[in-house]
Amino acid sequence: MIKYIGVFAFLVGGFCHDFETVISNQDPIVDGMRLVEGDMLFDDGPLFTERNAVKYDQQLWPNGEIVYEISPGLRQYEQIIREAMRTYEDNTCIKFRRRTNEADYVNIHVGDRCYSRVGKSFRGGPQPLSLGRGCTDFGTILHELGHSVGFDHEHSRADRDEFLIIHKENIKNGSEHNFDKLWENNTRTIGPFDYDSIMLYGAYAFSKDTRKFKTMEPVEPGLPMKSVIQKGKLSYYDIVKVNKLYKCPPVNPYPGGIRPYVNV
């Protein structure tokens, strides 16, 4: 049975800004890795463009087990972080285990923005997942954990132009690269395009004016494009894709065949 925790139950401590309005619009180097599309870290160099789901099995967590450590600065948010982890655990074969002395782990800490390494680092050792101001709602934590599991943004898929209209004229200056598409021959694309995915930003992401100008909208008119914080849950196909990537046993997260709209 799929288990969801609604986003609004976890808007605590004043960190309730939509992270799509606070993520970086540049590609700096953070901990020796390149920050791409605002919140994803990749090992700097030619491999950092090879994205969607991670391409190489070495970037998957062995046996689907992700070792983590939560910094003391996030103690008041530990419950919501664990609830987000349990959402993956309850619906996929991914497991999160608190670190004892393991060398390879996700270091969940308070940074100056929201970001995560995508998949397991080739280099090994600790890899950052930052939950700064505006990053501690349930949907955003699910999103950043999705990067740690191994997924890129849905709006960067090589086939995204079949499903999304990108309004380049509405993108704020310096943020255009956040809408670059993946290279089709350098990515592992899994499943159909999913408008409900927690890995898809909302219609106003990186907008010059988030009250007026959409930067993305569905090709099919009338379909909603909620922000990550508004979604606040994994979609059916988020779950299917994780299970496929990690070769999990079959799972039916929607008993009775109830599924959200997905453009196949």
Curated annotation (Swiss-Prot):
It comes from Loxosceles intermedia. One of its GO terms (biological process) is proteolysis. Disulfide bonds join 93-248, 114-135. Its main location: secreted. This is Astacin-like metalloprotease toxin 1. Its EC number is 3.4.24.-. PROSITE patterns: ASTACIN (PS51864), ZINC_PROTEASE (PS00142). One of its GO terms (cellular component) is extracellular region. It comes from the Eukaryota.
